[in-house]
Amino acid sequence: MHNSLAELIKPRTVEVVPHGSHSARVVIEPLERGFGHTLGNALRRVLLSAIPGAAVTDVVIDGVLHEYSTIEGVQEDVIDVLLNLKNLAIRLNGPHDVYLNVDKHGPGPVLAGDIEASHDVEVLNPELLIAHINGNGRLRMTLHVQKGRGYQPVANRAIEGDSAIGTLHLDASFSPIKKVSYVVESARVEQRTDLDRLVIELQTNGTVQPEEAVKHAANILNQHLAILVDLKGEDLPLFGEDGPQFDPLLLHPVDDLELTVRSANCLKAENIFYIGDLIQRSEADLLKTPNLGKKSLTEIKDVLATKGLSLGMRLENWPPEGLKKLNQ
């Protein structure tokens, strides 16, 4: 029997079953045979690499110049303290990175709940042990928390050259997803017994709920695949009759991003006038711009992310001929 595209089975139910702390099982069924692995693998990869989160990226500890030091009056050495800080589950509700302080006298433990957080910062695991203070010891440190995606080693992260002496840089795991796996089981609809049931098991650090993480991952996939729905449609306009194809958003001036005056002026000073110009610059390139620091860089990255763009992208045949006339 000939099967048309209209006869493909589509998922009818999505069941979210919470279990344990910040964990859930997501069941999607029914699916055509093979679609379980297709969707499961794609969702798993996106969940692990593309869900945004926050992490400690830099630490300054009073009396410490490098990570191989010890801290007077503190049981743990510096490396152990830094490793503990990597397990911090923190949510930033504002658009910018933040600096948080810890100032604790001994004796006793230093917990994540001892971090002095502002109203737009939430520590989701306040019971996390950071260090033990002996006797009359004291631990004072400043934590730099940034937003990001995936895992970023220090070597791959743009760092300002004027970092203060004693600043300790951490490899940052921004992903709020702690574990994710999937299995494909057999499903049945009426007389068909060759269908798939996709079961996704995931655990987050509490900064995002499992159901929201899956929705976000599905939305990311949808945005990337939507452009393929109609390759000849108006969603892929031509610049000129025979010219290269560009997303019209890239042809807009950077003023349309509504950046702060400081950030916008810094970009224009570097001859970055269009969004297409901007996305081709790397973080390291922008940090070399006079008067543009990490705060401005974070603002630019956040605004681009809301439009599905990022720094470091590459565009063939850019700029298109006649671009300057487009927005006059």
From Swiss-Prot:
Keywords noted in UniProt: DNA-directed RNA polymerase, Nucleotidyltransferase, Transcription, Transferase
Pfam families reported in the protein's UniProt record: RNA_pol_A_bac, RNA_pol_A_CTD, RNA_pol_L
This protein's record includes keyword Magnesium: no
A single cellular component GO annotation: cytoplasm
InterPro entries: DNA-dir_RNA_pol_insert (IPR011262), DNA-dir_RNA_pol_RpoA/D/Rpb3 (IPR011263), DNA-dir_RpoA (IPR011773), RBP11-like (IPR036603), RNAP_asu_C (IPR011260), RNApol_insert_sf (IPR036643)
Gene Ontology biological-process annotations: DNA-templated transcription
Presence of keyword Kinase: no
Family statement drawn from the similarity comment of this UniProt entry: Belongs to the RNA polymerase alpha chain family.
Comment field on protein domains: The N-terminal domain is essential for RNAP assembly and basal transcription, whereas the C-terminal domain is involved in interaction with transcriptional regulators and with upstream promoter elements.
Reported function: DNA-dependent RNA polymerase catalyzes the transcription of DNA into RNA using the four ribonucleoside triphosphates as substrates.
Protein name: DNA-directed RNA polymerase subunit alpha
Gene: rpoA
